[in-house]
A protein has these predicted regions:
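Short beta-strand "wing" residues that participate in macromolecule-binding interfaces
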Residues: 59
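N-terminal helix-turn-helix DNA-binding core of bacterial DNA-binding proteins
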Residues: 2-40, 62-64, 71-73
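Glycine-centered, phosphate/nucleic-acid-interacting loop/turn motifs that mediate DNA/RNA or nucleotide
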Residues: 55
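Accessory beta->alpha helical hairpin/"wing" motif in late/C-terminal subdomains of nucleic-acid enzymes
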Residues: 74-78
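Amphipathic alpha-helical dimerization/coiled-coil segments
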Residues: 1-3, 20, 79-99
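Basic amphipathic alpha-helical segments that dock to polyanions
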Residues: 48-51
Length: 99
């Protein structure tokens, strides 16, 4: 059996969690992602920057009243990368054990 390579950008736990949230929600605000992942604000910011630099997500900075609001949205490139990652992961899980 040939295993498909796993995207190292998505293989990191926090980045995978962010992408999983965005796959099901399409977009989410920073505090929601932070709450759902249990990440620190600093670490989450770094990981979001990496996903954004790769073109997997778009980051929009706006204001809600006078407060800053960061919104993350998955891109079509990010959706395709996530789907490819899931398919590659399945190649590792689809192992038949013979006795």
């Amino acid at each position: 059996m040939i295993y498909q390579p796993l995207d190292p950008l998505l293989h990191a736990e926090l980045r995978l969690a962010v992408m999983s949230l965005l796959i099901s929600n399409l977009e989410a605000e920073f505090p929601y992602i932070k709450e759902q992942t249990g990440a620190t604000a600093g670490n989450l910011s770094v990981q979001i920057d990496k996903l954004s630099s790769a073109g997997y997500i778009k980051v929009k900075k706006t204001f809600k009243g006078k407060r800053p609001c960061t919104i993350c949205r998955i891109t079509s490139k990010g959706q395709k990368a996530f789907e490819a990652y899931v398919q590659a992961l399945k190649s590792y899980l689809d192992v038949k054990i013979e006795n």
